[in-house]
Curated annotation (Swiss-Prot):
One of its GO terms (biological process) is heme O biosynthetic process. It comes from Shewanella putrefaciens (strain CN-32 / ATCC BAA-453). Pfam families: UbiA (PF01040). This is Protoheme IX farnesyltransferase 1. The keyword Transmembrane helix applies. GO terms for molecular function: protoheme IX farnesyltransferase activity. Pathway: Porphyrin-containing compound metabolism; heme O biosynthesis; heme O from protoheme: step 1/1. Keywords: Cell inner membrane, Cell membrane, Heme biosynthesis, Membrane, Transferase, Transmembrane, Transmembrane helix. The chain crosses the membrane at residues 29-49, 51-71, 101-121, 123-143, 150-170, 177-197, 223-243, 244-264, 281-301. Converts heme B (protoheme IX) to heme O by substitution of the vinyl group on carbon 2 of heme B porphyrin ring with a hydroxyethyl farnesyl side group.
Amino acid sequence: MAKPLTITSSHSHFSLAWRAYFEMTKPKVVALMLLTVLVGMCLAVPTAVPVQPLIAGMFGIALMAGSAAALNHLIDRRIDGMMARTYNRPLPKGRVSAKRALIFAASIGGLGFVVLYVLVNPLTAWLTFASLIGYALVYTAYLKRATSQNIVIGGLAGAMPPLLGWTAVTNQFHGHALLLVIIIFTWTPPHFWALAIHRRAEYAKVDIPMLPVTHGVEFTKTCILLYTVLLAIACLLPVLVGMCGPMYFVCSSLLSSVFIYKAWQLKYRDRDGLAMQVFRFSIYHLMLLFMALLIDHYLWS
């Protein structure tokens, strides 16, 4: 009787450990990021994306993004343990040790780099590595704790995925790819500031100088509203350069209008839970916007 119990116990332990490591890669965040990578790939060519850069590129970028997320968990483990939103993460709860988290992050990051360098191209490998360093070290380890503009400056690393997808297919920079980077770069501040308003007390408790902590909630609401207007303009850039057609224009205009309206509500008609509604809508905004880019590309071309 003991042997089956041991097998069951071992299987259960392995399953729990696997889930803990998987959680450290922030799979939902990476999934949204991979959508923008895919759109970058598809928009880079007029026909179907070649199979090798598609599969190897998505796999390698996903591994390195997961590595960056795991490093974020490792670096933030102390403050994560003090915040209600993050206290149950694997490192604060002791489900994964700091040493094993570092080994895991280095392993999948190294594998991802090799995949991109060998099977895709060196340019994409190095750009993805730069994004990893920008997010995990420049933003998480320094900017996040150093300035209220942490999200604005550090947002560049998180805005890179469409460019990575583009270079994975073409092995070169292109102005159209940079327009996609600008969209995500402009989207990032209102997205995170809405969350920061909702979690202001927690950020203040752990001495993270998010904008609502350093400049107040009302100032942050104003900044969110202004950035949603700026984002609406950025979202029209692909139309202005002839990169997209009427279908994307309509979808972009509708999404931008709703985002601006919600930001206006947050500023002038705030109520309990509205900041989190704005935060959640921003996720759908980016997802639907890039899906519209993808669909329009094949309709327009």
